[in-house]
Amino acid sequence: MNNKALVVIDLQNDITKNYKEIIETTNQAIDWAAANNMNVVYIRHHNLSAGTRTFKPDTRGAEFVPELKIVSDHIFTKTKSNALTSEEFAAFVSAHNITEFFIAGADATACIKSTCYNMTKDGYAVHVLSDCITSYDKKKLPEMLEYYASKGCTVDKLSEIM
């Protein structure tokens, strides 16, 4: 494996139904990453807050969406927005000397935003795959793409990097 990783964030059953618009391209990104000897990593969210019903551990809602292609056992669980708060994921990044990330998944205004911000703050190269992310509020996607760029991420379509 090289020092790059595709990170697929929170494509779980409780996520927005808008994921259906990006699942084909996301699966293409997974194939591309695997073919290029990149680490393919899956992040799932577990909501431990008592007052909420989504992303609860051991529920169907917390499972990955059935259409998502799983090509590795690099599956990590987070309980906060930023994927790097998962100690297991952070240890994996360190152990594999990963310095460059390609980001896919949801939600563009929450977990992807926090993860990208913190990755760039920590000095990693971050590429947001604009046709592999979505949000509950798709009207905010253009604003989020500008935000990612303003924080040091590159924003590319999958076809531009393949």
Where are these regions (language model features)?
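Active-site-adjacent betaalpha module
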Residues: M1-A5, E24, Q28, W32-N36, ...
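Short, conserved beta-strand edge motifs with alternating hydrophobic and charged residues
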Residues: V7-I9, V40-R44, F76-T77
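Active-site loop/turn elements of alpha/beta-hydrolase fold enzymes
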Residues: L11, H45-N47, D131
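Short acidic, Gly/Ser-rich segments with clustered Asp/Glu that frequently serve as metal-coordination loops
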Residues: Q12-N18
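Flexible, glycine-rich phosphate/dinucleotide-binding loops
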Residues: I15, S49, S135
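Flexible, glycine- and charge-enriched loops at secondary-structure boundaries
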Residues: Y19, I23
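Von Willebrand factor
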Residues: A33-S49
